[in-house]
């Protein structure tokens, strides 16, 4: 009896790319619009980014909030009560998280040049611009970055996402709820909230936290759903998150 098969189907480009990341994947932050928000492709990884939670962030910043939310404003005064702070899009939040993941690798591992230098440049590009393409001019970098190295970078980014997943929602028990990474020009703080991850970018000296004369800060919210697909044992983790839900936290 005849049966249908897919024996000679072409391998989709996406599956093919999963075997290894090429340099161009690290230097392209490809964005397409969706009904819920955006689809982002970077380093062989596809992210679904949503607008969820952003309206609430704007309300907290502009005083248009319920009295019960005042604790959240007081917990992050350098963001919600600082005239020098600005709200960015969730796409920006994802870029900062990816840049932080790269910086985490540079801190954790003794990477050889030119790999460390190249990663530093890619991290700066993600952190300080909103462009979709970074032109890596150095030929030496291109020659020495093997597929194995690039795939290692990708797997380390996924490990960093799991580090974020291991954080607890902001709590009263002293459990770890934030990751902080300092670079030469910035301080990145990523905090676990009920909705996902509150991402902030400050000056190296964290002057935004100076109550008398607050310095500049940028911040945004990346919804839980964007990173959920890349976390290990996410169903168990989701159950524990429900248990530690902080009802007094607006976001």
From Swiss-Prot:
Changing residue 170 to A: Complete loss of interaction with NP. InterPro entries: Filo_VP24 (IPR009433). This is Membrane-associated protein VP24. One of its GO terms (cellular component) is membrane. It is a peripheral membrane protein. Prevents the establishment of cellular antiviral state by blocking the interferon-alpha/beta (IFN-alpha/beta) and IFN-gamma signaling pathways. Blocks the IFN-induced nuclear accumulation of host phosphorylated STAT1 by interacting with the STAT1-binding region of host importins. Alternatively also interacts directly with host STAT1 and may additionally inhibit its non-phosphorylated form. Plays a role in assembly of viral nucleocapsid and virion budding. May act as a minor matrix protein that plays a role in assembly of viral nucleocapsid and virion budding. It is found in: Virion membrane; Host cell membrane; Host endomembrane system. Its main location: virion. Changing residue 187 to I: In strain: Isolate guinea pig-adapted. Transmembrane segments: none annotated. Pfam families: Filo_VP24. Changing residue 50 to I: In strain: Isolate mouse-adapted. The gene is VP24. The keyword tRNA-binding does not apply. One of its GO terms (molecular function) is structural molecule activity. Belongs to the filoviridae membrane-associated protein VP24 family. Keywords: Host cell membrane, Host membrane, Host-virus interaction, Inhibition of host innate immune response by virus, Inhibition of host interferon signaling pathway by virus, Inhibition of host STAT1 by virus, Interferon antiviral system evasion, Membrane, Viral immunoevasion, Virion. One of its GO terms (biological process) is symbiont-mediated suppression of host JAK-STAT cascade via inhibition of STAT1 activity. Interacts with host importins KPNA1, KPNA5 and KPNA6. Interacts with host STAT1. Interacts with host KEAP1; this interaction activates host transcription factor NRF2 by blocking its interaction with KEAP1. The keyword Metal-binding does not apply.
């Amino acid at each position: 009896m005849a049966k249908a098969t897919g024996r000679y189907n072409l391998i989709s480009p996406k599956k093919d790319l999963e075997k290894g990341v090429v340099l161009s994947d690290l230097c392209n932050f490809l964005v397409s619009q969706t009904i819920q928000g955006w689809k982002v492709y970077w380093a062989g990884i596809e992210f679904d980014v949503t607008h969820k939670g952003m309206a609430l962030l704007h309300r907290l910043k502009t005083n248009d909030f319920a009295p019960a939310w005042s604790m959240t404003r007081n917990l992050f005064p350098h963001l919600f009560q600082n005239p020098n702070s600005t709200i960015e899009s969730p796409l920006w939040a994802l870029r900062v998280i990816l840049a932080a993941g790269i910086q985490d690798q540079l801190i954790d591992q003794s990477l050889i040049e030119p790999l460390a230098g190249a990663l530093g440049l890619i991290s700066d590009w993600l952190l300080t611009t909103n462009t979709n393409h970074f032109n890596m001019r150095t030929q030496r970098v291109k020659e020495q970055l093997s597929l194995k190295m690039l795939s290692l970078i990708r797997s380390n980014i996924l490990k960093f996402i799991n580090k974020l997943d291991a954080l607890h929602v902001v709590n009263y028990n002293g459990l770890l709820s934030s990751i902080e990474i300092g670079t030469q020009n910035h301080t990145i703080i990523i905090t676990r909230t009920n909705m996902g991850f509150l991402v902030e970018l400050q000056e190296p000296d964290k002057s935004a936290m100076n109550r008398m004369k607050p310095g500049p800060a940028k911040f945004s919210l990346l919804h839980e759903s964007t990173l959920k697909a890349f976390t290990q044992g996410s169903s168990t983790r989701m159950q524990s998150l429900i248990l530690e839900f902080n009802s007094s936290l607006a976001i």
